[in-house]
Amino acid sequence: MLSYVYFGTNDLARAIGFYNAALAPLGMRRCITNDPEWDRSSAGWGTYEKGGLEELAFWIGLPFDQQPATVGNGGMIAFRARSWQEVDDFHAAALAHGGSCDGPPGLRVKYSPDFYAAYVRDPDGNKVAAVCRGITQRQ
């Protein structure tokens, strides 16, 4: 269904440090584009194969219109986690690298009995979550 998601940032180096740390517990690694011009203005995590023909990625970068990046009210991206521990590690890494807590790790039974999630704001204010489904107690 999706090809990619793109968030704007006003400080690419800071954002790269934040997402390298926050997404590592979820098993996500940086995309390689082999395009030096693109790599100076953006960074991605996930899959970027065959020059983008096979892409499922999360990107951050400087806005294309060269105006300041701003956050959307109500917008959020949630990354899939394979365990509660991955959610916990995502949250801890995000806070240790300039993020702020927007909802600590825990079950959100109002959504579903197996909805374990943590919510953070990245250094630019974008809302990001990690969610684990299919487990109802700590293992």
Identify the residue ranges that each predicted region occupies.
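Vicinal oxygen chelate
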Residues: N10-R14, I77-A118, P123
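Long, continuous compositionally biased terminal/linker segments
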Residues: W38-D89
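Short, contiguous alpha-helical
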Residues: Y119-G134
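A short acidic/small-residue loop/turn micro-motif
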Residues: V109-K110, R133-Q137
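A short local loop/turn or secondary-structure capping micro-motif enriched for an aromatic residue
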Residues: Q67-P68, G98, T136-Q139
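Short amphipathic alpha-helical segments
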Residues: M1-V5, G72-I77, Y116
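Core segments of cupin and vicinal oxygen chelate
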Residues: Y6-E54
